[in-house]
Design a protein with these regions (language model features):
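Conserved AMP-binding A3 loop
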Residues: 30-32, 167-195, 199-203
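Conserved pre-ATP/AMP-binding loop-to-beta segment of ANL
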Residues: 17, 153-171, 178, 213-223
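Conserved AMP-binding/adenylate-forming
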Residues: 34, 247, 265, 303-332, ...
Length: 548
């Protein structure tokens, strides 16, 4: 039995055709509409010469058309490839070439960038433009308009039989280097990231029809909202998971905190997905400000908050629980290269350590391996790397060297994905995440993981956001430098921040430099821009105005 992305969606569309699948602004689709439109679009792609195995990119802001494009690509067994809409021309040229794109869906506003690089990409033949009224004349590109592509395609689902081996490629920038394409088999990504395994019970789905049959048997639908960019893994996989399960998925084009709360009220959203503090802090502070002004929003439908892919500080979790005492908060760890690695349900009594990453129950097939690729003993205090076996990616596209570094064969003979996240195994078997090794600071032989220092700093009432990096030091090799964004009207000295943090982390981990900025640079997914912070810290500037 094959678990294929397109098949799983079609099963749900057949089971609950009239139910709402997607909402974005005033645009919405039922499952039947979404299926027919993506089927038509798939036929148009095939008519343009896209064949099974061809790579087709999606370069656009969040929209229903983004999801329709993914479904269309997978329906004809081609390979969807995400494109970061923040990339400049040089980065786009690299990604389009590295990914061997044969086709591209792009938002109208990004047309000029596509035009600037297309002539150097002989493989890229098929262009489909998602119209949004934000672009310039596209005559030099001669794209097919998205709605024309839908209109001209056949609505008949007469596609060749699909396979669990059909691929999805997710490009990830990580914390360093050029973007790398992670190759997932359809079946593997379903079980690792798209709901194929229950994160609480660890029980896998046994039939490709199991989720669609449950959706048909249910009396109603859950309403999920996924504000992060679809171009990143978290929102992309969550959106498809919701479709497989027959839920309503609410998308937003851009992250605007006040609009998020108003949409939660309007659509009676039950569950919200965020990416750590970069989204959580603005959300809770905006809500607090709205309510302080006397605004009364009906948020009674809001039942759960899920965070992944970035640090979600205990202090911020506590503010959500102060406002929503019965809110179920889950904090999970994982990576594009490995899939879901673990989860913790947060409560007032279990907010997490103010220094260090989340402490989670490991997911199915997740272990921590030591330097000899053997499992770390619980409670030993040994720092190892998080690794995941089972349903994991094939590797990086066209990069065998980095593939060999990230996917390893351990002492037990099993193949594991090991992206580089350091962790310890506690006595009870839970995992405490310490941070990514590529940004680890070595000061006098002691290892300092930026995330634990960042969490300690962000627990200070004056600090809105912080990124920590290592800078050269004649005596210690490296010293800890903090780049900090204060709350409006607030300030603190380096000594005040050190004194506050001393209660949470060891003395050698305390920052020895403070660089104050008016805005911390982060990716749209909420991840810290460590190269930016390191360049800033090494510049010697201690008060820096960051342009919007």
């Amino acid at each position: 039995m094959a678990f294929n992305v397109a098949d799983l969606f079609e099963h749900t569309a057949d089971a609950v055709p009239e139910r709402t699948a997607l909402i974005c602004g005033e645009d919405r689709r039922s499952y039947a509409q979404l299926d027919e439109r993506s089927t038509r679009l798939a036929h148009t792609l095939a008519d343009q010469g896209i064949v099974p195995g061809d790579h087709v990119g999606i370069y656009a802001l969040n929209s229903i058309q983004w999801i329709e494009a993914v479904l269309a690509i997978t329906k004809i067994r081609a390979v969807p490839v995400n494109v970061n809409y923040r990339y400049v021309e040089e980065e786009l040229r690299y990604l389009f070439d590295n990914a061997d794109l044969k086709g591209l869906f792009y938002g109208e506003e990004f047309g000029p960038r596509v035009a600037a690089v297309k002539d150097t990409l002989p493989l890229l033949k098929t262009l489909v433009m998602i119209e949004d009224g934000a672009g310039e004349n596209q005559a030099d590109l001669d794209p097919i308009l998205f709605e024309d592509a839908v209109a001209k395609g056949s609505p008949v689902r007469d596609f060749p039989k699909r396979s669990g081996d059909d691929q999805v490629i997710i490009y990830t920038g990580g914390t360093t280097g050029m973007p790398k394409g992670v190759m997932w088999r359809s079946e593997d990504i379903f079980f690792a990231l798209m709901g194929g395994v229950d994160p609480f019970t660890r029980e896998p789905v046994k039939s490709e029809f199991e989720q669609s049959e449950k959706a048909k048997a249910s009396a109603g639908q859950l309403v999920f909202m996924t504000p992060p960019p679809l171009m990143h893994g978290a929102a992309f996989v969550a959106s498809l998971m919701n479709l497989f399960q027959g839920n309503v998925n609410v998308l937003v084009r851009k992250f605007e905190p006040e609009e998020i709360w108003r949409l939660i009220e309007r659509h009676k959203v039950n569950s919200l997905l965020i990416v750590g503090d970069a989204m959580a802090r603005p959300l809770i502070e905006t809500l607090e400000a709205l309510e302080a002004r006397g605004e009364k929003l009906d948020l009674s439908s809001f039942l759960s908050l899920s965070s992944s892919a970035a640090v979600f500080s205990p202090a911020v979790k506590e503010r959500f629980l102060d406002r929503f005492p019965n809110l179920v908060i889950t904090d999970s760890i994982g990576a594009t290269e490995s899939g879901f690695n673990g989860l913790v349900t947060v409560s007032k009594e279990n907010l997490g350590n103010k220094a260090g990453g989340p402490r989670v129950t490991p997911g199915k097939d997740t272990v921590v391996l030591d330097e000899n690729l053997r499992p770390v003993e619980p409670g030993s205090g040994v720092v190892g790397k998080v690794a995941r076996g089972g349903n994991i990616p094939l590797g990086y596209y066209k990069d065998p060297e980095k593939t060999a570094q990230t996917w390893v064969t351990a002492a037990d003979g099993k193949r594991y994905a090991m992206p580089g996240d350091f962790a310890m195994v506690e006595a009870d078997g839970t995992i405490t995440l310490l941070g990514r090794g590529s940004v680890c600071i070595n000061t006098g032989g002691e290892k300092v993981y930026p995330e634990e220092v960042e969490q300690a700093l962000k627990a200070h009432p004056a600090v809105f956001d912080a990124v920590v990096v290592g800078v050269p030091d004649e005596r210690w090799g490296q010293k800890v430098a903090a780049v900090v964004e204060f709350r409006p009207g607030c300030d603190a000295t380096l000594e005040e921040l050190r004194e506050h943090s001393r209660a949470h982390i060891a003395g050698y981990k305390l920052p020895r430099e403070l660089h104050v900025v008016d805005r911390i640079e982060r990716s749209p997914s909420g991840k810290p821009d460590y190269p930016w912070a390191k360049t800033l810290a090494e510049s010697g500037n201690y008060r820096v105005a960051v342009s919007p």
